[in-house]
Swiss-Prot record:
InterPro entries: AGPR_AS, AGPR_type-1, NAD(P)-bd_dom_sf, NAGSA_dehydrogenase, Semialdehyde_DH_NAD-bd. It holds the Pfam family Semialdhyde_dh. This is N-acetyl-gamma-glutamyl-phosphate reductase. Its main location: cytoplasm. The keyword Zinc does not apply. The lineage of its organism: Bacteria, Pseudomonadati, Pseudomonadota, Gammaproteobacteria, Moraxellales. It comes from Acinetobacter baumannii (strain ATCC 17978 / DSM 105126 / CIP 53.77 / LMG 1025 / NCDC KC755 / 5377). It is found in: Cytoplasm. GO terms for cellular component: cytoplasm. It comes from the Bacteria.
């Protein structure tokens, strides 16, 4: 049994981590911090956890966190990097659900997140936690940068094409049209997230530039093993009036080799042994409700024209897009079965 700390337990990803870890047979949450709710029983804030835990929120105490085997940071950007060096020096592993360890390019990080990185030496040795694509590195990691929710759908949606020995798609004109529920914006109060602003409404945001764009580009370059080939990539996220769920629609142009390839078979073979990636039959329509509460991502392919491919990827943004994938990474880091604590089935209807 490993001991776990969660920094930032009152946000959506923090409480989702707790919900998942309370069912984990080999992990016990011992520290759960909050800047504003120290001393309050968790079940008083989240009644779904009544009868499942007697934990109370506490102030952040670095010495208490050092006693844990692993610490998750479900915090705003910039928090994990302030504490990562002290924790790993004490032998504690770190999994950050914010962006502190996602981008290896410091210039891009500072541009998009508006802060100087506090520990570039730790960043250099950290591992990007897209589980299905970085499994062996994750097993050896001390610090994990958990991927963003949108980048998870994009990478898993495109990886079979980019990993192929042949160039199957034109990489300079990829279009990603992505939609997310409002929980992706976090739990803090803001005008744009209140009910009357989102109910009966559907809008694009971050059209001029979104923080996940450089993460997507850097990650795709690493998958493809090529630099500067995704300059023309377009990424537009949208907010839909639901709490959980994410659907990315990815449009690509096929090369001559791509036109001749059985792309359905390519995807099915690529993900044949993956427990959390479901390749649906061709021309299916993955629904967000089918993965609600589950650590699964469903993919479907359409080929509307000989030289066009549409990839649909659906996930729960709080689970496979955040906390579930973080626990998946924890399992690898400690030699557990990858699906420990993650066998939950999506809630439908």
């Amino acid at each position: 049994m490993i001991s776990v700390g969660i920094v930032g337990g009152t946000g959506y990803t923090g409480v989702e981590l707790l919900r998942i870890l309370l069912r984990h047979p080999k992990a016990q949450v011992r520290v759960l911090t909050s800047r504003t709710e120290a001393g309050k029983p968790v079940a008083d804030m989240f009644p779904n956890l009544r009868g499942h835990t007697d934990l109370q929120f506490s102030d952040l105490n670095i010495d208490a966190l050092k006693e844990c085997d692993v610490v998750f940071f479900a915090t705003p950007h910039g928090v994990a990097m302030q504490h990562a060096k002290d924790l790993i020096a004490a032998g504690t592993k770190v999994i950050d659900l914010a962006a502190d360890f996602r981008l290896q390019n410091l210039e891009q990080f500072e541009k998009w997140y508006g802060m100087e990185h506090a520990c570039p030496d730790v960043l250099k040795d950290s591992v990007y936690g897209l589980t299905e694509l970085n499994r062996e590195k994750i097993k050896q990691a001390q610090v994990i940068g958990n991927p963003g929710c949108y980048p998870t759908t994009v990478q898993l949606g495109l990886a079979p094409l980019l990993k192929s020995a042949q160039a199957l798609i034109e990489t300079k004109n990829i279009i990603i049209d992505a939609k997310s529920g409002v929980s992706g914006a976090g739990r803090k109060a803001s005008l744009g997230m209140i009910y009357s602003e989102n109910a009966d409404n559907f809008k694009a945001y971050g059209v001029a530039g979104h923080r996940h764009h450089p993460e997507i580009v850097e990650a795709l370059e690493n998958i493809a093993g090529k630099k500067d080939v995704f300059e023309g990539l377009l990424f537009v996220p949208h907010l839909v009036p639901m709490i959980r769920g994410m659907l990315s629609t990815i449009y690509v142009d096929l090369t001559e080799a791509g036109k001749q390839t059985d792309l359905q078979a390519l995807y099915e073979n690529f993900y044949a042994n993956e427990k959390f990636v479901d390749v649906m039959p061709a021309n299916s329509s993955p629904e967000t409700r089918s993965v609600r509460g589950a650590n699964e991502l469903r993919i479907a392919l359409y080929k509307p024209q000989p030289n066009k491919l549409i990839i649909l990827a659906a996930q729960d943004n709080l689970v496979k897009g955040a906390s579930g994938q973080a626990v998946q990474n924890m399992n690898l880091m400690f030699g557990f079965n990858e699906d420990e604590g993650l066998q939950g089935i999506g809630l439908l209807p």
